[in-house]
Every structure is written in C-alpha cells, then in structure tokens.
Regions:
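Hydrophobic alpha-helical scaffolding
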Residues: 61, 93, 148, 177-184
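Conserved nucleotide-binding/hydrolysis micro-motifs of P-loop NTPases
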Residues: 32, 57-60, 94-98, 120-125, ...
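Conserved G1/Walker A P-loop phosphate-binding module
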Residues: 1-66, 78, 82, 87
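Conserved C-terminal guanine-recognition region of P-loop GTPase G domains, centered on the G4
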Residues: 42-47, 70-145
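Amphipathic alpha-helical transducer elements in NTP-driven molecular machines
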Residues: 32, 36, 65-68, 72, ...
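Cytosolic regulatory modules rich in charged/polar residues
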Residues: 167-203
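Canonical P-loop GTPase G-domain recognition
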Residues: 122-176
Length: 203
C-alpha cells in the first residue's frame, strides 16, 4: 500500500513522516526539478507494509510554486514515473484548522480515499479550544484521527486506523481543474461553516 502525506508547510507533516518511518527513508529529488522527494516504509503492528511519501508542503492544489506543482501532479497521478497513492493522509495543524481544511476540501473533490490527521491536537487542548472530531468527520465525510508529531506515541491512532483500512481498489483521481475565484470563495465559505459547527473557542 502507498500513502501520501499532504499538508501545508509547518503543519507537522514531516515530523509525522519521521515518526511513522523512523530511519527507513530515502531522500532524492524529483526528476527534472530541485524539489526533494522523501519516501519511507512503515511496518504496522499487524505486519502491514506501507510505503509513505512525504509530499512537498502546499497551501493549495492551485499550484503557485514548483513544490505545489509537484504535489498536485503526484496527488492527481500526473507525475511521470510516480504512481498515484492509494490513500491521502491530509495533515492539518489543529491550531490553524482553517488553513488546513481548504486543502482537505480541494483534495476531497478528486474522490480519492482520504483520512485527516489532526496534528498538534494536544496544543489545541492546552489553548482551551474544543474540536468536535466526530462532527468534523461527518461534515468532511472522511475519518479524522488525532496525532502529535513530536511525541513518540503521537501517531498510534493513525497507525491503528491504517491497520484496519483496506483499499477499495480501482480508485482514481478525477481530473484536477484549477479553481476559479467563485470556487475559491465557495471553498472558503464552506471552511468557515464547518469551523463554526466543529470548533468551540474558550469563553
């Protein structure tokens, strides 16, 4: 099974990648560009072998940089020599949920199997912010698991979920169409709606 970690810069994605793969990783460049390619291997407690790809950080699939273009092409299966992932793990920073959910909604539109890794969930609790994970799952229509990339056991819930997940087979990304201004606005409005429902700030 191949999974790809998708997320914006500084969301804790690479820390989570290191936690999942340990020293079993290989670093190179994508062909034709000076963008780093990081892949590792996770062996789950149940013995499942998972190839983990740490995609370049991206704020949106509407690519504005070489890093974002590589990420978009890998996710959509358009990158030469790179098989499309079986599963997208969309890593979001729980303390900056608005930033991460935009990417989640963009990626969801392509119809690939997805799970959200809500990283830094411990930090958000320390701030007195309550996130209704079950409600978030319902609104996003995908599983949401809590992770803490800087803690030794911080990926245990994600690994447990991966152990129980089985690819449906035949899943292919829909063709990616860059969002126009109206679609970007619609996505932003949907993110705000979900946040109003799922997040309770301290009084």
């Amino acid at each position: 099974m191949r999974l790809a970690l998708l997320g914006h810069p500084n969301c804790g994605k690479t820390a989570l990648f290191n936690l999942l793969t340990g020293s079993r990783q290989k670093v190179a460049n994508y062909a034709g560009v000076t963008v780093e390619r990081k892949e590792g291997v996770l062996t789950s407690p149940a013995g499942k072998t998972v190839r983990v790809l740490d995609l370049p950080g991206a704020y949106s699939l509407n690519a504005l940089s070489a890093d974002e273009a590589v990420t978009r092409d890998v996710v959509t299966g358009q990158r030469a020599g790179e098989a499309a992932p079986d599963l997208l793990v969309c890593v979001v920073d729980a303390t900056k949920l608005q930033l991460g959910l935009r990417m989640v909604l963009e990626a969801r539109a392509m119809g690939l199997p997805m799970v959200v890794a809500m990283n830094m969930s411990d930090a958000v609790r320390r701030q007195g912010i309550a996130i209704d994970r079950a409600l978030l799952e319902r609104e996003l229509r995908m599983p949401v698991v809590e992770t803490v990339g800087i803690r030794k056991d911080g990926a245990s819930a994600l690994v447990q979920w991966l152990d129980g997940w089985q690819p449906a087979g035949g899943a292919q990304a829909s063709a990616w169409q860059p969002q126009g201004p109206a679609q970007v606005l619609q996505t932003q409005q949907e993110v705000r709606r979900i946040l109003r429902l799922a997040v309770r700030e301290p009084e």
